[in-house]
Amino acid sequence: MAIKRPKGTQDHLPDGSPKLSLDTRAAAFTFVRETARRVLERAGAQFTDTPLFEEAELVQRGVGGSTDIVRKEMFTVYYFGDHGGFILRPEGTAGLVRSYLQNGLKQLPAPLKLWTHGPMFRAENVQKGRLRQFHQVDYEVLGSADALVDAEAIALMTEVVRALGVQKVKVKLGSIGDPEDREAYNTYLRELFTPHLEALSDDSKDRLNRNPMRILDSKSESDQTLIAQLGVRPMLDFLGEGARTHFEQVQAYLNAWDVSYEVDPSIVRGLDYYRRTAWELHHEGVGAKSALGGGGRYDGLAQELGSKEVVPGIGWAFGIERLLLAMDAEGVALPETSGPLLYVAAMDDENVTYAATVALTTRRTARAEFAYRAMKPAAAFRDAERRGARFIALIGSDEVAQDTLSIKNLQTGQQSKVQTRDLQAFLAGQADQHSPAIPHDPTPQEKA
């Protein structure tokens, strides 16, 4: 029996693969990451990264023991004599805050803007837009409790998504108040739901004591029916003066910047460390629950992880796979990836090394590939065209003796005879017509 990839995972495939789709196209993931990098780094965010596995206690304390993530969805790591003290990270925020505290990043100018991307792991039921290994872009700001920081974070999230060509998104904005506001709301919910305990799902019965607010985002249809029947008051009704003023300020900034949003009293974040601002970004084309991602403020997280000081923080994340589904639903076409600018082939065995040297030299300034064995011209042309090359250089004994290259433009059919020493200048004149479709960081040679 052939070994297959685990359920709930995907291979990211090169262009031209027979089973290619937008959400399995490796170039699509590169495009999303590079677009996010450009937008976020222009806003002052710095890239960081954390391990794929962390201490289980980090997630238990940082995410919250009452969440589905901790109770049902963690992948535990076992090795040698270990007894399961590590987990594959289910989200990025707790690890980034742990890194901030452990590495003394509070010494850097505040607020500190960080961003990252990478795989996350949750043992979820697999469905459209829900995978067990999925990929996120994550943005965090540490060191400021200002409402202006919240508004900027929301604006940046929408800017990244729109830069990717996705327009039909909706920001659903809410607030879950301060700890005392949440406690008052939880007391209200316990009193409301306790007489109807038998009508709750088993999960929600457990949540009633641990974290009643989590009942409101239950996936159980019977729970949602009961919530509607009881006419549950929204969290916004319980905001104290500080949280309410903060929420109004966030909206004022968004209005000033023409960032479209709707206030949604039902927004309840599933993670226990959130305070005040919370939001979700929705798109109808992504399947389950339609959320591309979300974010919120988590001023209590650093102390939960052992900090002696309050470290205000806010952040967001979106799933790359879900975003690609939204792009597909809107018919967004990725820029075409380009093949090599130059393909070099030797026509006889003794000149293969020479051809390879020409290609390697060309790579100082442009993308080039070469044939690993001697080829007849017809076969070389076919191979170059399959690879999407723009130019082909055929090298035989005459070319080597004369130190020249016979170059043909595969798009126009134009042929040129170029001195080998002039190849870089010849190709430089073509570079602006053959720039890569996927944005990239310049090489040291390109910087020079």
UniProtKB/Swiss-Prot annotation:
Its EC number is 6.1.1.21. Its main location: cytoplasm. One of its GO terms (molecular function) is ATP binding. It is an enzyme of class 6 (ligase). The keyword Repeat does not apply. Keywords: Aminoacyl-tRNA synthetase, ATP-binding, Cytoplasm, Ligase, Nucleotide-binding, Protein biosynthesis. It is found in: Cytoplasm. PROSITE patterns: AA_TRNA_LIGASE_II. The keyword Transcription does not apply. Homodimer. This is Histidine--tRNA ligase. It comes from Deinococcus deserti (strain DSM 17065 / CIP 109153 / LMG 22923 / VCD115).
